[in-house]
């Protein structure tokens, strides 16, 4: 699988709220940097925690690129009645696994 395929699979697992499927796409030592958080979530259990904390939302893909072990996917993320923003998912890959994930947010309204 390419890095882009792994990243797409991860986003699909998040949307489906399948924490185990998302965690399996990551290295043992993965770090997830959430916007506004002081410390990253670490390890596959941190990925599972992120999915348990996430609100229900709708996503549509807008842009994606892969370059030198990094994948960037931008989505329009909507939680109806709560928020809408453009989310850029920044994946750093280690072979065919996600080693680091961070986010850039931009308002959509």
Q: Which positions does each model-derived feature cover?
A:
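A beta-strand edge to alpha-helix "cap/lid" segment located at domain peripheries
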Residues: 48-109
